[in-house]
Amino acid sequence: MVKERKVKLKNKNGDTLLVLLREYRKGDEEGMIACIRDEYGETYFKRDFYDPEYIKSESDNHHIKFLAAQTEDKEIAGMMILKQFYPEESMCEIASQIFRKKYRGYGLALPFFQYGLELLKARNYSAAYCLPVTFHHITQVLLYRSGLRAAGFILNVFDLDKIIHSYENGRNTKHSQAIQIMALDKRDAGTLYLPVEHQKFAGMVYESLGVNFSFHKEKMISEWGESDMPDYSDMTFSNDAVQSNLEIRVLLVGRDFKKRLLNLHRQFPLCRKQTASLFLNCNDCHAVKAYEILKKMGYFFTGLKPLCSEKEYMVLHNPGKVQIYFDDYMVSSEFASLLLYVKYCYERSQNMVFGLGKDG
């Protein structure tokens, strides 16, 4: 059992801060909400977190484990959550680490992350998962020190006109997230059906995670037929109308894949700020065929979501009309090389979409 703990911290001026790191207790709700409001005002994308009753019920139902950093005078200096996704996914996400501004600069983030990871490791999860922001790299660096490794990006998730925070956005109009992973119970990714062009990237990610994996020898695309495909794809989707973000998950590719994708694009046209991210099961032997279809429709490779469920996923994105300024992202040195590769994939995709270059 992981016990609550006290940590003593100093800022650069020599001021000390004694904080108790612990699990949520009833009565913490208003203090946690105050942390959110101090940074985001009323614009935090997890709107339910402004509701004290939601925090109580999610904690009671064990869907979300809320954690608190409490000062000597009983004020909540910071909050964080551990969120599980059973039965769809077997990982646990460490997320929503938010501090009141007056308690920043003491180095509280690292011990708080480490405390959360200890709680997480005490359970049987396939992986620890985090989506750090890209408007600063503090979280990325601290998670790396804690053992999480870079795997890619989920682009254009949140409309920056609808979120207020205390960091610079640069020229981007939508906020993107990085993907960081630590392997826990899942130690074998199985056989991966990935395009040859992305296998070097994927190999680096899986090797950094220290798990077993293998690449299936890719057939020539012309050899991939539909005769051995199932009739119907297994796909799910959700669209966040507030953030103009469509998320598609493809568990199985069938003959109807392109038709169903086109129908989704008709339902949620990629105009104005509407964008789409797609998670493609790359343990499916038809993933390469699906990738070729997606590439022709304006999607490009942005990384991997590994070890989070029974299946492995590559991540793709269609920015629609949204311009992406990768140079304005704030990323750690570990993410920098991955970002350069994703930027290359984006520029190649844009050339294809606008007829400025050759396919591939």
Give residue ranges: language-model regions.
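Short, cationic low-complexity segments
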Residues: 193-225, 329-360
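Conserved catalytic-core motifs of GNAT/GCN5-like acyltransferases
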Residues: 131, 144-170, 300-311
